[in-house]
Regions:
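N-terminal acidic, proline/glycine-rich, low-complexity intrinsically disordered segments
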Residues: 1-9
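Structured, contiguous alpha/beta core segments that scaffold functional sites
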Residues: 2, 13-17, 21, 25-31, ...
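Binding/recognition "hotspot" determinant
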Residues: 50-53, 58, 62, 66-69
């Protein structure tokens, strides 16, 4: 009697769905570049989740102190172009705290996006009506300077479609890291193991 050949049951090889390559490929397929910040990658965090560090009293106090220093720094316009300079000085004086605070958000998170809403004055001039910081997860900075809005399966180049509507501020961006360098990612492991 012939011996039955035993078929060796083996598991199929994994396609590596949990590897960085798979995650990067999925992100590329979806159109969003994977964040290459090493700390965020190792911790499994998104940039928005760095906000948990702001709950720490020491970190929050240090960030607030630095923001206050920036807000209280003197500013001036170098060139004088007459009526336009006067108009811009009035505008910047009115919106100084909102503009500087919104741009400063790039320090802890690497980048920030502000949306400006305009109004028409009685003497037919466009002026700022509102300027607000928008959520990081809605936008993707590109290494060529473009800003992409991603929401509800849509992708819009906001600089092309809405010029002077959205303002991107980045901290130390590079070609490889267009999202900028977030300060809070450097504190993450120190905070986590405290």
């Amino acid at each position: 009697m012939a011996k039955k050949s035993e078929s060796k049951k083996t598991k199929p090889k994994s396609a590596g769905l949990m590897t960085e390559v798979a995650v990067e490929n999925l992100a590329f397929t979806l159109g969003r570049k994977a964040d290459i910040d090493e700390v965020l990658r190792q911790a499994g965090l998104t940039r928005q989740r760095l906000s948990v560090l702001m709950v720490d009293d020491e970190i929050a106090q240090a960030m607030e102190t630095r923001l206050d220093a920036v807000l209280n720094a003197p500013w001036r316009f170098i060139e004088d172009h007459g009526e336009q300079t006067v108009f811009l000085k009035e505008l910047f004086t009115r919106w100084h705290a909102e503009i500087v605070s919104g741009a400063w958000e790039a320090c802890p998170y690497g980048y920030s996006v502000m949306e400006a809403n305009y109004a028409l004055t009685s003497d037919s001039k466009f002026t700022l009506n509102e300027i607000v910081v928008k959520p990081l997860e809605w936008f993707e900075p590109k290494n060529d300077g473009r800003l992409i809005y991603r929401q509800n399966a849509t992708e819009v180049d906001v600089n092309a479609k809405y010029p002077l509507k959205f303002f991107l501020t980045r901290r130390k961006p590079t070609f490889k890291q267009p999202y900028g360098d977030p300060l809070l990612s450097k504190l993450y492991w120190l905070w986590f193991f405290r």
